[in-house]
């Protein structure tokens, strides 16, 4: 056994021990109504990665609402820190191999689910998907949780990855009109102006790699358009493609306008730079909205949001699934049915910063930024794309390669090398593992 493999096993073991030792977190401590004597209290073990500001509060509110509805079920939440589930995936792998999965766990819609389905580690939940749900969930979102003609997950939210979050005080100070930013070139023109005035234009925190890949995917659609994005996730480009090299050059440009210590920071630490006025903007998903609100900032007063590029909605969808060997499948099914309701989604999403996937959810509880996103998502003119960085659009093995390539590019700035490595990774890990043909136009 290699030393590197041994260290990996020890890390996974330590993560499992830490989350198991954490006990019951995130549910309501005392049910509103007590179970009757004939009812036996059931435990519902849930694993998720919502630990940052806004995220934890959103899950706690959701858990409290569920326990009020089902007082004979007690939630045992095991949050595993690490944005995008970077650490949770390792913990789940260990639990699955041991044959002791949680009752349900968080996973992104799309390809990220495929590893569990291929290994027969998830149970189809067609019975959970009522006609009401099918009617009120957008078709593209339903397709992201259907494999082999079966539903495998229930989406709780819709996040948007392609958003620039900016400090309104800084923009006002330097006379920057946010409505002037429509394209990636507009964005870099603003970045240059800020840099000339001694302000760090972008806050980046790519210690966990995925935030850098997320910047890359936004550059991909901003530079190449939706048609080119589709070709990329279908593995239909070459190393000599001038558009790919331009995308990589724009990524390097973004990094050069960012804080020098980006590789040491997490996504929420990057958001903190914007909050503190140490950077003007950050390119991040709308979970940043929940972060800023948790800090006491008011949307469209202290900070604003600019979709980039305009007219595109980069989908990041959080779901929950039913493991095949769940200890409490009936309790898990109640949870899955619950999170598919308007009640649950309008409890969770206003706090989280995301929006509800259900089209019939009233927009009243949402802030102005979320309301504008709800309107865009429902517009026939908005182009919907699945996120690469968050495991929806491409096979997991290829995403792991891409994370490493983009992370290295952030330091090396070697565009030609990165382009060659991306195409090689497509041949090795995207095309052989391809199970979906995306049609985005």
UniProtKB/Swiss-Prot annotation:
Taxonomic classification: Archaea, Methanobacteriati, Methanobacteriota, Thermococci, Thermococcales
Membrane-topology annotation of the record: Lipid-anchor
Domain of life: Archaea
Family per record: Belongs to the bacterial solute-binding protein 1 family.
Residues where lipid is bound covalently (S-archaeol cysteine): 24
Reported function: Probably part of a binding-protein-dependent transport system PH1214/15/16.
Signal peptide: 1-23
Location(s), subcellular: Cell membrane
GO cellular component: plasma membrane
SUPFAM superfamilies: Periplasmic binding protein-like II
Organism: Pyrococcus horikoshii (strain ATCC 700860 / DSM 12428 / JCM 9974 / NBRC 100139 / OT-3)
This protein's record includes keyword Translocase: no
Protein known as: Uncharacterized ABC transporter extracellular-binding protein PH1214
Pfam families assigned to the protein according to its UniProt record, in alphabetical order: SBP_bac_1
Residues where N-acetylcysteine is found: 24
Alphabetical list of InterPro entries matching this protein: Bact_solute-bd_prot1, SBP
UniProt KW keywords: Acetylation, Cell membrane, Lipoprotein, Membrane, Signal, Transport
Disulfide-linked positions: none
């Amino acid at each position: 056994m290699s030393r590197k493999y041994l260290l990996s096993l020890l890390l996974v073991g330590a993560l499992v021990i830490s989350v198991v030792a954490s006990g019951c977190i995130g549910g309501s401590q005392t049910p509103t109504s007590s179970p009757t004597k004939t009812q036996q209290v059931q435990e519902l073990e849930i694993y998720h990665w919502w630990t940052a500001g806004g995220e934890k509060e959103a899950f706690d509110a959701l858990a409290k609402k569920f326990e009020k509805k089902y007082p004979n079920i007690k939630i045992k939440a095991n949050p595993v820190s690490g944005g995008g589930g970077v650490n949770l995936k390792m913990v789940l792998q260990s639990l699955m191999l041991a044959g002791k999965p949680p009752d349900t766990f968080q996973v992104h819609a799309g390809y990220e689910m495929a590893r569990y389905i291929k290994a027969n580690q998830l149970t189809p939940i067609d019975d959970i998907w009522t006609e009401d749900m099918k009617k009120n969930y957008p078709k593209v979102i339903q397709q992201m949780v259907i494999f082999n003609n079966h539903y495998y997950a229930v989406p709780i939210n819709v996040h948007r990855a392609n958003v620039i979050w900016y400090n309104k005080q800084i923009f006002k100070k330097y006379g920057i009109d946010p409505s002037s930013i429509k394209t990636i070139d507009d964005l870099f023109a603003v970045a240059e102006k800020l840099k000339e005035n001694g302000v760090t234009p972008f806050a980046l925190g790519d210690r966990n790699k995925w935030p850098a890949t997320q910047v890359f995917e936004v550059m991909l659609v901003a530079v190449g358009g939706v048609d080119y994005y589709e070709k990329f996730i279908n593995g239909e480009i070459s190393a000599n493609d001038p558009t790919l090299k331009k995308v990589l050059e724009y990524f390097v440009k973004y990094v050069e306008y960012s804080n020098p210590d980006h590789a040491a920071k997490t996504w929420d630490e990057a958001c903190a730079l914007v909050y503190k006025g140490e950077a003007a903007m950050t390119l991040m998903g709308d979970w940043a909205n929940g972060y800023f609100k948790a800090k006491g900032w008011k949307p469209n007063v202290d900070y604003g949001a600019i979709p980039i590029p305009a007219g595109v909605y980069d989908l990041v969808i959080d779901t929950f699934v039913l493991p095949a060997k769940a200890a409490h499948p009936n309790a898990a099914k109640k949870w899955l049915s619950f999170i598919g309701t308007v009640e649950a989604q309008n409890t969770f999403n206003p706090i989280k910063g995301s929006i509800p996937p259900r089209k019939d959810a009233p927009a009243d509880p949402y802030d102005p930024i979320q309301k504008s996103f709800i309107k865009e998502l429902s517009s026939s003119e908005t182009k919907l794309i699945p996120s690469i960085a968050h495991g929806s659009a491409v096979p997991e093995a290829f995403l792991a390669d891409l994370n490493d390539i983009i992370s290295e590019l952030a330091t090396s700035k070697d565009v030609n090398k990165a382009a060659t490595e991306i195409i090689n990774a497509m041949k090795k890990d995207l095309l052989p593992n391809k199970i979906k043909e995306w049609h985005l136009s």
